Every structure is written in structure tokens, then in C-alpha cells.
């Protein structure tokens, strides 16, 4: 059931990350060129693109699952990856096992611990994120309202706290936090104007850090440190030129500040440093793959043997399939290849362009999928957006530079690149995310065959339903009906404009590629380093805090306690108690993860319902929204625990 859910929820990832960029380019004034919008969608075009994306994502999702058969052998059998955070799911499965085997009291205690911390997490997030205070046309979380109320002029809590983040002093405008320190000619002396330091109040990142421990968490943060304390300040300090879509020219970054100031560090990060980070993710991943070439050769040899009819270990006589048949991998590759050509040709693109996309998809899903699996296994975070940028770069590089040969207009080239990247996002997400299902199956005895089967069953409904909702929200986002950050979609839209106008700094990608290779050679975790550089300090710092907290807890609290037990009851009892005590902390961490997951899901649903209400600021809706939210969570808790 869990594997089917994984397939259903991640088959539409590409639509969530990439597809909204199409509507932003068509409707958002920020991406208009001097000649008008880069993309113009006629009646029926959106439906046509959605049809192509949904059907193609199904096949791509199947391919992603097939490729993981190879990755499972490499990074779960030959060279196992830790996958921080999988312990939480494993503990939940352990609770279910206790119930089935009669250990009901132990299961109840475990479930109670997780439930208590889930509740504490949701209450905390309710105060931090739920729009409890409605004033005029603004909806504020309680903590944001307190911060703004406790501010006088440019001084007060709002300067150091906003939107769930405790951050460096940023200043305020009318009592509202500016979020980031503004750079201007008058504030050029301020070191905070060149970087962004803070801590996001996210329990899940602390929990993941707890699972990681200090070393792995530090390596992820090392990329963040290099990005935010070295590269970003350099870009701002040396007035590095960045591309401006409206003027269609490279503009020195300090020119954006004008006389009033601007958050140049965020501009430097989004326009330059993230490009280096993407290169680092790919460079570290490629070098890591090169180090594992012998293992890959052995697996490809097994696939070749399976195609020749030679005996293999995936089928057990009298017991059935243990692993999905290896011979199906090339069959799925061929099926996906020709399906992509057919789908995109029916969708109105030339056969040659469809052929090129199909080839890129087959190749990149394997190579970048391997990188995604590795990053997911090392950090618990999947770099879907980073790897998708590489695919978009490849597709636009080919389509925009061979428009006459491929019979493509500039609009067609952009659309094909974005739809193709959407499809890739679904494939890469399936390859990377399913590692959690397979990791848990190793511990509980499920056959990989059944996990693969569940993943495949979930792809079709997930692609249809998830894509439908994502498209609906994309249209509303572009029209301005709803306000969402959509950082990945905006980044893809910006990227598309840059390449359509033949601008951009490809050498930054190459620089990042070399940096990622070096860190992979030096530490063995170049992809984690690149991912850290891709994220902001407030997002990664909680992981480091969590990892350091666990090491300190083990050293100061756990070790003395275990040493005492060892003296009194012997080594065997001490090791047993150590495992039980450590598992109890995993249950707390599981509660933190579960609480944030529940709250995030419910908040997304409520935000969606907000768009359907005639007057989203009506008092009746305020009461109904709040009462519904509370009753929903009380009901869920009652059903689980009573």
C-alpha cells in the first residue's frame, strides 16, 4: 500500500515543479519581453499540453521504477546508503508488527509517543504558520502578528522574525518585515546585505538532522556555507552582471538596488549561485557514478544474461519472483522510447524533435536518476529541481539552436522543453523516492518485486489526479487569483527566457561541475554538498542543529547511562537498552516528521478551498475554516488512539 501511495503521489512531481512555468510565461507580466509574452496559449493549447504531459508522465514513471531495479542493487545491496529519516517509517511498521504479534502494549506506547509529538508539532506549526489573524486584506499567523505588533518604526521583532524564520536584522516597512537585509549605496558597509542567515522553524529538518548526525549534516551545510558566505557575497561585492529579461541585457547586480535598496543577496543566489549548485550536484553525482563503474558493469552483464535466457536470481523456483525481471528493463526502455515519439507527434511537434526528446529522456532518466537516488540516500532530500534544470538546459540547447532542422518556432521549442522537463521530473521523482520503500522492505522482508508492482500501480491515478490539480493551480497562480511562492516554476520560467534570448552563463554550470567533482573526490558526498549550496541557510541549519544535538545527547546523556547499565547488568543488557533508548528518540523524530507532513497537507487543502470561496475574508469562512481544521485533527487523533 505504501509503495502504491509513493507511485500515486510522485508521478505528478513534474507538473508541480515545472508545468506552472508555461502559464507564468504566458500570463505573468514579469516574464514579458519587449515584443510581448514569450508564449501565447490559444484555446485548447493548455488541454493539449496537459494531455501530452499526463500520458507521457505515466510511461516515464514506469521507466523510473524500472531503472531503480538497477539502483537498488548498487545503493541498497552493494554499497548501502543510510537514507536519513527512513527510521521513522520503519518504526511505524514495527508498531503494526507489534499489534499483529500480540505485543499490543508496546505498540500502544510507541504510537502514543509518536502521537504526542505529532500533536506538539502541529500546535507549534499552528502558531507559526496558520493564518489566525485576519486584518483588512491580510491574513497573518499569530507569531507574525505578534512580531509586527511588537515593532516600533524600523525596530522590533518583525526585523528579526517573519514567516516562520528567525533571521538576521532586515528592517521593516510600516511594521512589516522586509524579510531580507536590503543593499543600497548607503548600506554597502553592512555585512548582512551580502548574505542571508537564519533558522527556519521546521521540525522535520531537525528530525532529519537527528537521523543524519553531525558529519552528514555538516557536509550538506558545507555547500550552504560556501554558497552563502563566499559565493553570494562575491557576486554582490564585485557587482557581477546578471541577465534582465525585460531589458534583454546583462545588468550589474548593484544597479537593481537603485536609491531605495533591494535584497541583492537573494538575486545573486537565484541568478548565479544556484546555477553553480546545479553543476555541483551533477558533477558530484557523475564522479560518484564513475567510481561505481564496476558494479554497474556487473549489473548490465546480468541484464544481458537475462535477455539471453540465462538463469538469474530474481526468480525463485517454487516461490515466484523475488525481484522484477531484469529482461523487462530494456523492454520498458523501448516501449517508452516509441511511446514518447508517438505522444509528442500526436501533440503537434515534429517527429525529429520528438525523437530527440525520447532519446534525451531515456539517457538522462538513467544518469540523473542515479544521481537523484544517491542524493536521496545520503541526505533524505531528492534534487528533482536541480536535475530537471540540467534536462531543460539540454532540451532548450538543442531545440533553440536547431529550430529550422526540427521545424520548431521559438514558442514550440520552449513548450517542448518545458513539457519534456515536466515528464522527466515525474520519471526522476519515481527513481529517487522509491528508495525509501525498498529500504524498508529489506528490513521487514517484503520482496522488491511486490514493491515495484505497487509503485507501478500507483503511477496512473497519481499522474492523472495530481496533474489535474497542479494544472488548475498553475492557471490560478499565473492569473494572480492565488499567491504562491512557486520558486521552482519561477526559476524554470526565468531560465527559459534567458535561453530564448541566447543569454546565460554556462561557465557557471561548468565551474559547479568541477567543484562537485572535487568535493566528491575529497569527501565522497559531492552531491550532498551541491544540494546544500542549492538551499538557503535557514533551511539547512536546522539539520545541522539536529545532528549536533544528537551527538551531544549521545555523549552527555546516553553514554553515561549505558556505561552504568553495563557495570550493573553486563554488556548484552547495556546494548539492548541502548537500542531501545535510541529507538525512543526515533519515535519522537517520527512525530516531528508526521506532524509537519499532516499540517502541510491540511494547509495546502485549505489554501485550495480558499480559492473556491466567494468571499475568502468573510467572518463566516474564518470561523468555518478554523473549526473545520480543529475538528479534522481531533477526529483523526480520536480514530487512531481510541
What are these regions (language model features)?
Residues 1-642:
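Alpha-helical multipass membrane-protein architecture
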Amino acid at each position: 500500500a505504501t509503495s502504491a501511495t509513493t507511485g500515486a503521489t510522485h508521478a505528478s512531481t513534474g507538473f508541480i515543479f515545472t508545468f506552472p512555468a508555461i502559464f507564468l510565461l504566458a500570463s505573468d507580466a514579469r516574464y514579458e519581453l519587449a515584443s510581448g509574452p514569450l508564449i501565447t496559449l490559444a484555446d485548447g493549447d493548455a488541454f493539449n499540453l496537459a494531455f501530452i504531459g499526463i500520458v507521457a508522465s505515466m510511461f516515464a514513471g514506469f521507466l523510473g521504477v524500472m531503472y531503480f531495479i538497477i539502483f537498488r542493487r548498487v545503493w541498497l545491496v552493494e554499497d548501502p546508503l543510510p537514507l536519513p529519516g527512513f527510521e521513522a517509517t520503519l518504526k511505524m511498521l514495527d508498531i503494526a508488527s507489534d499489534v499483529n504479534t500480540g505485543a499490543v502494549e508496546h505498540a500502544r506506547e510507541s504510537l502514543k509517543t509518536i502521537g504526542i509529538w505529532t500533536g506538539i508539532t502541529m500546535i507549534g506549526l499552528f502558531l507559526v504558520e496558520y493564518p489566525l489573524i485576519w486584518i483588512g486584506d491580510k491574513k497573518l499567523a499569530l507569531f507574525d502578528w505578534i512580531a509586527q505588533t511588537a515593532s516600533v518604526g524600523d525596530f522590533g521583532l518583525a526585523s528579526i522574525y517573519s514567516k516562520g524564520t528567525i533571521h538576521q536584522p532586515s528592517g521593516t516597512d510600516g511594521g512589516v518585515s522586509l524579510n531580507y537585509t536590503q543593499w543600497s549605496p548607503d548600506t554597502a558597509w553592512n555585512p548582512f546585505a551580502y548574505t542571508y542567515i537564519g533558522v527556519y522553524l521546521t521540525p522535520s529538518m531537525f528530525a532529519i538532522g537527528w537521523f543524519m548526525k553531525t558529519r552528514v549534516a555538516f557536509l550538506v551545510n558545507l555547500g550552504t556555507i560556501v554558497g552563502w558566505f563566499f559565493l553570494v557575497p562575491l557576486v554582490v561585492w564585485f557587482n557581477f552582471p546578471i541577465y534582465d529579461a525585460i531589458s534583454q541585457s546583462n545588468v550589474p547586480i548593484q544597479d537593481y538596488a537603485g536609491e531605495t535598496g533591494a535584497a541583492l543577496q537573494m538575486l545573486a543566489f537565484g541568478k548565479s549561485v544556484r546555477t553553480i549548485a546545479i553543476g555541483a550536484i551533477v558533477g558530484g553525482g557523475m564522479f560518484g557514478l564513475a567510481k561505481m563503474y564496476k558494479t554497474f558493469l556487473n549489473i548490465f552483464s546480468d541484464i544481458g544474461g537475462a535477455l539471453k535466457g540465462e538463469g538469474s536470481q530474481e526468480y525463485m523456483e517454487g516461490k515466484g519472483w523475488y525481484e522484477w525481471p531484469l529482461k523487462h528493463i530494456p523492454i520498458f526502455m523501448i516501449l517508452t522510447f516509441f511511446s514518447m515519439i508517438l505522444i509528442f507527434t500526436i501533440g503537434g511537434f515534429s517527429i525529429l524533435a520528438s525523437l530527440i526528446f525520447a532519446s534525451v529522456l531515456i539517457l538522462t532518466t538513467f544518469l540523473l536518476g542515479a544521481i537523484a537516488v544517491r542524493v536521496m540516500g545520503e541526505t533524505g532530500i531528492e534534487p528533482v529541481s536541480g536535475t530537471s534544470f540540467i534536462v531543460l538546459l539540454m532540451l532548450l540547447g538543442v531545440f533553440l539552436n536547431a529550430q529550422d532542422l526540427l521545424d520548431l518556432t521559438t514558442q514550440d521549442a520552449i513548450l517542448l522543453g518545458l513539457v519534456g522537463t515536466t515528464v522527466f521530473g515525474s520519471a526522476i521523482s519515481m527513481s529517487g523516492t522509491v528508495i525509501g520503500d525498498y529500504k524498508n522492505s529489506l528490513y521487514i522482508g517484503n520482496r522488491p518485486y511486490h514493491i515495484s508492482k505497487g509503485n507501478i500501480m500507483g503511477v496512473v491515478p497519481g499522474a492523472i489526479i495530481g496533474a489535474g490539480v497542479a494544472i488548475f493551480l498553475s492557471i490560478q497562480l499565473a492569473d494572480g487569483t492565488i499567491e504562491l511562492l512557486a520558486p521552482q516554476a519561477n526559476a524554470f520560467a526565468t531560465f527559459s527566457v534567458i535561453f530564448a534570448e541566447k543569454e546565460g552563463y554556462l561557465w557557471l554550470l561548468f565551474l559547479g561541475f568541477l567543484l562537485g567533482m572535487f568535493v566528491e573526490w575529497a569527501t565522497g558526498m559531492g552531491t550532498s554538498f551541491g544540494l546544500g549550496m542549492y538551499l538557503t541557510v535557514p533551511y539547512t541549519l536546522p539539520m545541522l542543529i539536529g545532528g549536533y544535538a544528537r551527538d551531544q545527547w549521545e555523549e552527555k546523556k546516553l553514554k553515561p547511562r549505558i556505561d552504568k547499565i553495563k557495570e550493573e547488568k553486563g554488556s548484552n543488557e547495556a546494548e539492548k537498552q541502548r537500542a531501545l533508548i535510541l529507538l525512543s528518540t526515533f519515535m519522537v523524530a517520527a512525530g516531528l516528521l508526521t506532524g509537519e507532513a499532516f499540517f502541510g497537507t491540511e494547509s495546502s487543502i485549505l489554501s485550495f478551498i480558499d480559492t473556491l470561496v466567494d468571499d475568502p475574508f468573510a467572518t463566516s469562512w474564518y470561523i468555518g475554516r478554523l473549526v473545520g481544521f480543529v475538528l479534522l485533527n481531533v477526529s483523526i487523533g480520536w480514530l487512531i488512539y481510541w
